[in-house]
Regions:
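N-terminal leader/targeting and accessory segments in enzymes
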Residues: 1-48, 52-67, 76-77, 93, ...
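ATP-dependent carboxylate-amine ligase catalytic core
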Residues: 18, 22, 26-37, 63-152, ...
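Hydrophobic alpha-helical scaffolding
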Residues: 18, 194, 249-252, 265
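A generic structural signal for residues located within well-ordered alpha-helices
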Residues: 20, 52, 116-119, 180, ...
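Acidic, Mg2+-coordinating active-site environments of NTP-dependent enzymes
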Residues: 39, 110-111, 118, 131-138, ...
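Short glycine/threonine-rich catalytic loop with a Thr-x-Gly-x-Asp
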Residues: 68, 247-260
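Thr-Gly-centered strand-to-loop micro-motif
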Residues: 85, 193-195, 246-247
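A short glycine/serine-rich beta->alpha loop
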Residues: 107-112, 244-250
Length: 273
């Protein structure tokens, strides 16, 4: 199978893009021997800032010496960007081999997987084969019924900024959308929250209380911008000083606070960061 053939197969119209629900992806992964159970995860949802936050968390883990997978969507230039280990994109050869591997399983289950489910299965198999210590995994859409939510309880469930998006599927208010995204919080994990208005935060507080999952709200008040230029920003946050961020905008400082809060949570869970 060539790269063009692999991508054509993945992107076929019959894969139907993205359809909420876990039945197809769970059946596919079960047939594959459940590669999603062979890695630890940081699961990231939200409307805005997911990609930046995922990249920051993955960078922190990588610098700490962990073999770190990163699963994101969509891509900017090449499909390979969506699946990475330690900052290196999946190779064309691996895409071909893994697509050929997953294809018979995908065609054997009760209903063909969607495109996103197919890519998710390829990503999980790739991370499992390479024995990643931890994978930073970005939700495709929503949370509770997103294909990525088949993973076991993550080390941290991270909720980025909530906005009105995919309202036809997730709901027409911020609170309803928050409810869908809160579905990635599971018993046994810690939750990290981008600060929101009280009615939205209450949705996550209720979910965490029901599941006995600790909730950690990122501290935006401790952010202090020291300087900025075309090369990025330098800032203080809590006890950390002169941190450099190669991204511009106040919203990126907020995303950085979420990433740093996540790192602190992982540290408390035994990760050496």
């Amino acid at each position: 199978m060539t790269l063009d053939e692999a991508l054509r197969y993945i992107h076929e119209v019959c894969w139907k893009g993205t359809i909420p629900g876990l039945e197809r992806i769970q059946a596919l992964l079960d047939a594959m021997g459940n590669p999603e159970r062979k890695c630890k995860f940081v699961h990231v949802t939200g409307t805005n800032g997911k990609g930046s936050t995922c990249a920051m968390v993955a960078s922190i883990l990588r610098k700490a010496g962990y073999k770190t997978g990163l699963y994101t969507s969509p891509y900017l230039i090449r499909f390979n960007e969506r699946i990475q280990i330690n900052g290196e994109h999946i190779s064309d050869a691996d895409i071909c081999e893994l697509t050929e591997y997953v294809k018979p399983f995908a065609e054997s289950i009760f209903e063909r997987p969607t495109e996103f489910e197919m890519v998710t299965a390829i990503g999980f198999e790739y991370f499992a084969r390479h024995k990643c210590d931890i994978v930073v995994c970005e939700v495709g859409m929503g949370g509770e019924f997103d294909a990525t939510n088949v993973i076991p309880a993550p080390e941290a469930a991270v909720i980025c900024n909530i906005g009105l998006d995919h309202t036809e599927v997730l709901g027409d208010t911020l609170e309803k959308i928050a409810g869908a995204k809160a579905g990635i919080i599971k018993p046994g994990c810690d939750a990290v929250l981008y600060r929101e208005r009280p009615s939205v935060e209450a949705v996550f507080e209720e979910r965490c209380k029901a599941l006995n999952a600790p909730l950690h709200k990122a501290d935006f008040d401790s952010l202090h911008l020291l300087s900025h230029s075309l090369e990025g920003q330098v800032f203080d946050w809590e006890r950390f000083h002169a941190l450099r961020l190669p991204l511009l905008g106040e919203h990126q400082l907020h995303n950085a606070a979420v990433a740093l809060t996540t790192a602190r949570v992982l540290q408390k869970r035994g990760w050496k960061i």
